[in-house]
Amino acid sequence: MRHLVLRREGGVKFYAPDPEKYGGIYSAPVFYNPAMEKNRTLSTLLLKAYGKGGLVVCEPLSGTGVRGIRYAVESGVVGKLILNDISKEAVELIKKNLEINGVDAEVYNEDANVLLHKLKDSCDVVDIDPFGSPAPFIHGAFRALKEEGLICATATDTAVLVGRYPRKCLRRYGSVIVKTPFYIEVGLRNLLGYIARVAAAEDYKITPLMSYWEGHYFRVCAYAARGARDADDNFHHIAYIKYERGVRKILHAQSEGSSGPLWVGPLGDPLIINKMSEIGPYQDFLKILAEEYSISAPWFYRLPEFAAGGKSPTLKEAVGVLRAAGIYAVRTHMAPDGFKADGEYGEVLMAFKRYISSAHSLQ
């Protein structure tokens, strides 16, 4: 392949198409997005924190192969690496990048779903990192998984997941989404809800370890364990969310104006996130995730919802006000003016009203 540039990311070096020669990353013959470096770094940390050695790791949509190569080089837990891409040019590049990093892998040139079905019951980790939606590959990912393991998926079709394209959202994810101030979290829970329902259909129970939003994508990593009876537990965390005049409610059946079906359970595991924070970068981001995961409410609040006289407290002030009122509150990574709280809307509103009234009386 012509017009390659040598790049470095994490602990590896690799060749990727030169975007300047192809008019951008989306026109290159093999896709590589440098904006996904954080995604790859966090996923590598997650594998390392997961802590089980000798893992069979499959990346069926490999592109340049950098994600899988980073897993092999940096995590210390990969026993066997399986890389695949439907593009012959990508496969050639994957082999080149494996060689310069001294990494062994099985490399395939197949349709991703065909390969996943061939790998039935043989993988510890399946990482779906497509251009667009992971939905077409989730069934195959579970079929490739052993009795237990990790399922990871990235979705860049965020506009679909947050309900901006209702028909496509219904077709692709089987959900109806209504716009809310916390639409980012709804989109993330929409993706998790879809994965949980597919998991149940394939007789797997899932436990999210890390889920987050980053600008142009959603990312989910979940532990999965096979067992039909346990798989039913997924539905204990599937529900609908209704938003009306600030009030948020969980509903266990669809009603007019509700969004769902969504995952309303935990978005991740604070313990594994704290482990990740101890061994790698993005510590501030990971701290926010760990704090968010400790609050069960499947939504967040935004400062403008509680503004009085055109003014609202700063985020730091808001969190302090709520904690002083006995309501546990933390920042959210999903909005710069957002916070999660374990209180109902009315309780949060009343805490702010008391704070504003007190502030006025001191003037």
Curated annotation (Swiss-Prot):
GO terms for biological process: tRNA N2-guanine methylation. Pfam families: TRM. S-adenosyl-L-methionine binds at residues 40, 67, 85, 111-112. Keywords: Methyltransferase, RNA-binding, S-adenosyl-L-methionine, Transferase, tRNA processing, tRNA-binding. It catalyses: guanosine(26) in tRNA + 2 S-adenosyl-L-methionine = N(2)-dimethylguanosine(26) in tRNA + 2 S-adenosyl-L-homocysteine + 2 H(+). It comes from the Archaea. GO terms for molecular function: tRNA (guanine(26)-N2)-dimethyltransferase activity; tRNA binding. InterPro entries: SAM-dependent_MTases_sf, Trm1, TRM1_arc_bac, tRNA_met_Trm1_C. Residues 5-352 form the Trm1 methyltransferase domain. Its EC number is 2.1.1.216. Belongs to the class I-like SAM-binding methyltransferase superfamily. Trm1 family. Dimethylates a single guanine residue at position 26 of a number of tRNAs using S-adenosyl-L-methionine as donor of the methyl groups. PANTHER family: N 2 ,N 2 -DIMETHYLGUANOSINE TRNA METHYLTRANSFERASE, TRNA (GUANINE(26)-N(2))-DIMETHYLTRANSFERASE. This is tRNA (guanine(26)-N(2))-dimethyltransferase. It comes from Pyrobaculum aerophilum (strain ATCC 51768 / DSM 7523 / JCM 9630 / CIP 104966 / NBRC 100827 / IM2). The lineage of its organism: Archaea, Thermoproteota, Thermoprotei, Thermoproteales, Thermoproteaceae.
